[in-house]
């Protein structure tokens, strides 16, 4: 398959923001693929492989600038000036390639397979001479493709493809191309347990629909963790679950999957990023704690004070994430306990279709508690007084609140789903929203006065699952320390966009557009009708959306969440309705 077909499709996609049109373009492109299909899907995602494999080309913008200088015979300083002007390394590559007419006359057209193989070679090269090898590989691609080809290849290399589609839209296109919409829910469930779009596309094209639908948890392949709905009172939760419920501590840590096969242990975050190397103490302890041939566990990794046993908040664990050096020292200074609350696979058996009560029983009999692994504290009760007392104890112990788990016969583990089988109950903030929300940054406003030289406020958005877009819901300017405030431009630098990102829906024009990448936790006073924000626009009131009044940053950057994991538009709608219901009850 010629890469020019991919380039043509990407060019068409850049001219629309309508999800149906984007999907149609992708369907046509996918159907054009042959043995290149798996590689094609990864390139459409802007990746080389599924996230959990952690494969990256390791080529920075600076290295691309050096390579462009070599292939074009233009001084690096001049290439850097073009980069400063355009702000996008892909556009720089296109402009330079067009000016210098670099394409070799002897090279054949690029193919999808050749591009993917070359990028994989870039990613896997190591040792002395690896930088030169990557530059040489890039030069080869630059000489073989058109300026437009090079622009998109460069964006893929640097992880900045940004063609306006998410994995959800790509999955829709795969289903339409190789299956039938009536199986969408089952295929999406399979993807949630096996988040590899390239693999799923190939299986569906081969006609292996049944094997895809039957996909469950697989050791060493991370899944999308099950999520909880929210309610604001014990009575509501007990009523919703018909009195058949357990309540577990909701720990303030990092959601962690633990996969063990024989003596091999791998850890994954809720975003399917492998974190094994950052927690050598947990890996070592897991080998000593769990005596099974294979198991997959779900829990929360929480840092604690080794002298007092006091639980530290989520932010402290960030000192362990992404670290490569002095891990043993940090492990002693900031030890971790993983509080386990679920098991989805053991010794070759899929437990995802086993009711929660039985999964918990299996988990309780699996291991002996130690400093690194403990069971999430829980009670089984429908008595409001008992549950309220347990809730207060959870807050006293440094937790966020409780998670209610259904004890019904159909309380299965639903990967990636947010449903009423799990319901979270968090601290009731008086005169505030009764839960924190996680929003994606899509823009920034320059500061004035004391905030001159940095961003004074950020434009935040919810995620609209139906439209695969981000809808603005508030401007955030409160809750920042001075250190955090003045570090904002640096934090967002690589995500700045010259134009409004395709998936952002906004009537507000910020000073700086930011590509949806970073999620932050906020609290606010209430949800109100807004004539300017686009969250739920036209749903509650005609020509109006919803917004968060008096938003305040809690200090928690949700590095464990992808933008698509942020609070959804539908959740804001439900919170608004619940808020109105509560106010009505108080007045009566």
UniProtKB/Swiss-Prot annotation:
It catalyses: ATP + (deoxyribonucleotide)n-3'-hydroxyl + 5'-phospho-(deoxyribonucleotide)m = (deoxyribonucleotide)n+m + AMP + diphosphate. CDD domains: Adenylation_DNA_ligase_Arch_LigB, OBF_DNA_ligase_I. One of its GO terms (biological process) is lagging strand elongation. Its EC number is 6.5.1.1. One of its GO terms (molecular function) is DNA ligase (ATP) activity. Its cofactor is Mg(2+). DNA ligase that seals nicks in double-stranded DNA during DNA replication, DNA recombination and DNA repair. Belongs to the ATP-dependent DNA ligase family. This is DNA ligase. The gene is lig.
């Amino acid at each position: 398959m010629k890469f020019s077909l991919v380039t043509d499709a990407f060019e068409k996609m850049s001219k629309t923001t309508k999800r149906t049109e984007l999907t149609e373009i992708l369907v046509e492109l996918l159907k054009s693929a042959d043995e290149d299909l798996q590689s094609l899907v990864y390139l459409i995602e802007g990746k080389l492989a599924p996230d959990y494999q952690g494969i990256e080309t390791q080529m920075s913008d600076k290295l691309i600038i050096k390579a462009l200088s070599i292939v074009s015979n233009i001084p690096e300083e001049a290439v850097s000036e073009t980069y400063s002007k355009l702000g996008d390394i892909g556009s720089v590559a296109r402009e330079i390639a067009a000016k210098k007419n670099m394409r070799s006359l002897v090279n054949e057209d690029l193919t999808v397979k050749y591009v993917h193989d070359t990028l994989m070679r870039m990613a896997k090269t190591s040792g002395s001479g690896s930088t030169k090898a990557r530059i040489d590989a890039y030069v080869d691609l630059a000489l073989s493709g058109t300026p437009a080809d090079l622009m998109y290849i460069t964006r893929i290399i640097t992880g900045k493809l940004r063609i306006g589609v998410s994995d959800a839209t790509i999955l829709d296109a795969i289903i339409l191309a190789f299956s039938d919409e009536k199986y969408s829910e089952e295929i999406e469930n399979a993807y949630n347990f096996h988040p590899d779009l390239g693999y799923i596309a190939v299986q569906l094209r081969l006609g292996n629909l049944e094997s895809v639908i039957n996909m469950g948890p697989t050791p060493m392949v991370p899944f999308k963790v099950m999520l909880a709905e929210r309610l604001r009172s014990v009575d509501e939760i007990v009523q919703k679950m018909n009195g058949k419920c357990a309540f577990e501590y909701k720990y303030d840590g990092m959601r962690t999957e633990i996969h063990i096969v024989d003596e091999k242990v791998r850890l994954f975050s809720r975003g399917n990023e492998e974190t094994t190397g950052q927690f050598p103490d947990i890996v070592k302890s897991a080998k000593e704690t769990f005596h099974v041939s294979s198991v997959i566990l779900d829990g929360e990794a929480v840092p604690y004070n080794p002298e007092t046993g006091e639980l530290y908040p989520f932010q402290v664990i960030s000192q362990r994430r992404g670290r490569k050096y002095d891990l043993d020292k940090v492990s002693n200074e900031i030890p971790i306990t993983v509080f386990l609350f679920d098991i989805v696979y053991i010794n070759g058996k899929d437990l995802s279709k086993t009711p929660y009560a039985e999964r918990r029983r299996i988990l309780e009999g699996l291991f002996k508690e130690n400093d690194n692994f403990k069971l999430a504290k829980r009670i089984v009760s429908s008595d409001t007084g008992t549950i309220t007392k347990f809730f207060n104890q959870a807050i006293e112990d440094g937790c966020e609140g409780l998670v209610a788990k259904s004890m019904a016969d159909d309380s299965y583990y639903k990967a990636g789903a947010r449903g009423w089988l799990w319901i979270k109950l968090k601290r009731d903030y008086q005169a505030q929203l009764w839960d924190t929300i996680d929003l994606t940054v899509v823009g920034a406003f320059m500061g004035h006065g004391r905030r001159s030289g940095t961003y004074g406020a950020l434009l935040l958005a919810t995620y609209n699952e139906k439209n695969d877009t981000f809808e603005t819901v508030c401007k955030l300017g409160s809750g920042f320390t001075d250190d955090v405030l003045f570090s904002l431009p640096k934090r967002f630098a690589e995500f700045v966009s010259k134009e409004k990102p395709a998936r952002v829906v906004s009537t507000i024009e910020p000073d700086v557009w930011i590509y949806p990448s970073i999620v932050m936790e906020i609290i606010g006073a209430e949800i109100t009708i807004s004539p300017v924000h686009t969250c739920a626009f036209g749903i509650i009131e005609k020509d109006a959306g919803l917004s968060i009044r008096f938003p305040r940053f809690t200090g928690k950057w949700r590095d464990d969440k992808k933008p698509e994991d942020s609070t959804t538009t539908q959740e804001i709608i439900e919170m608004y309705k619940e808020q109105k219901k509560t106010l009505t009850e108080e007045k009566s």
